């Protein structure tokens, strides 16, 4: 199928649309949801309201840049992950918009997941060669997910995503955001906490990294970081320790998953993975010689680029 493919993603953090063609990104538009200072996120009803308010403006930009008649298919994140009970009301805004556009244009609609979108976005560029592998590991590290996955490509697309493990309590992004809120940083706090960590003069604080097999626990590390801040520890040094803890945790998870599956490559995706500091620390802590890949930093945070590519590849694989 030649033409353009539209992707729509309405997550807990961002309203996103994207348009792709072959292997290139034609359009990538996003609006971050507004969270009051001091807040730890939005209620689903508030997020849904903001998506409905944001989508018309984003679609106006789409139609100003792209001839709708060139759109050959539409993809939408219909759920957070592929798990059977995975559901969040915020995705309804994207689903209804995608259904309306696909119906008006008489083009097929592909329902995918937010997680698959992240994985596919992280493959954009040089990592698309992973689709040629028999299997590879993936980590989806964000405010709502800290998942260890085994991905099986097939027929030029992501065929299956098998969960191997996860965080048993806090997600990595939650840990970052909670400490950021305590420090008075805007939500989501990732880029602000990373900037603060860059000011650390001493790097001796070591938060516990709790990993069992392919699952982890971050609540203990978060509690200790909170106590350190309450005790007067320098904020920048605690911020650095958070990223160091996450780096050690991710390396352990990848190593254990590699031992379990025999996969030799891991792709790290999700908003937390956009941190250049985290990437550097993971490289320093990777004493196992693991091949750890990342997507472009701009495509690690919530976006619809991966959703659009996933839809394109799904539809093209159906061609007779």
Which sequence ranges carry the predicted segments?
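Short glycine-rich phosphate-binding loop at a beta-alpha junction
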Residues: 68-79, 261-272, 293
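Glycine-rich phosphate-binding/hydrolytic loop that grips phosphoryl groups
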Residues: 118-121, 295-320
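Short glycine-rich, Thr/Ser-proximal phosphate-binding strand/loop in the N-terminal lobe
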Residues: 11-49, 157-163, 294
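Conserved phosphate-binding catalytic cores of ATP/NTP-utilizing and phosphoryl-transfer enzymes
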Residues: 1-3, 107, 111-136, 310
């Amino acid at each position: 199928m030649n033409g353009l493919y539209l992707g729509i993603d309405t997550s807990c953090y961002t309203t996103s649309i994207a348009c792709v063609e072959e292997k290139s990104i034609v359009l990538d538009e996003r609006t971050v949801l507004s969270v009051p200072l001091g807040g730890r996120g939005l209620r689903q009803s508030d997020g849904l309201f903001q998506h409905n308010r944001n989508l018309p403006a984003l679609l106006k930009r789409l139609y100003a840049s792209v001839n709708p008649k060139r759109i050959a298919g539409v993809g939408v994140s219909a759920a957070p992950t592929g798990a059977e009970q995975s559901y969040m009301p915020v995705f309804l805004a994207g689903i209804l918009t995608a259904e309306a556009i696909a119906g008006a244009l008489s083009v097929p609609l592909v329902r995918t997941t937010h997680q698959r979108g992240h994985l596919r976005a992280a493959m954009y560029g040089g990592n698309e060669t992973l689709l040629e592998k028999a299997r590879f590991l993936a980590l989806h590290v964000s405010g709502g997910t800290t998942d260890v996955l085994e991905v099986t490509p097939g027929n030029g697309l992501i065929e299956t995503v098998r969960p191997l493990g996860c965080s048993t309590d806090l997600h990595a992004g939650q840990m970052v955001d909670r400490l950021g809120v305590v420090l008075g940083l805007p939500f989501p706090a990732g880029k602000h906490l990373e900037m603060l960590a860059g000011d650390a003069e001493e790097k001796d604080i070591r938060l516990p990294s709790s990993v069992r097999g392919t699952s982890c626990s971050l609540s203990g590390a978060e509690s200790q970081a909170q106590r350190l801040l309450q005790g007067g520890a320098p904020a920048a040094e605690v911020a650095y320790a958070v990223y160091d803890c996450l780096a050690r945790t991710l390396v352990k998870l990848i190593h254990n998953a590699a031992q379990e599956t025999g996969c030799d490559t891991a792709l790290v995706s999700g908003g937390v993975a956009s941190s250049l500091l985290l990437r550097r620390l993971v490289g320093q802590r990777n004493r196992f010689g693991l091949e750890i890949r990342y997507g472009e930093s701009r495509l690690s945070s919530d976006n619809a680029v991966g959703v659009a590519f996933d839809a394109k590849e799904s539809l093209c694989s159906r061609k007779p």
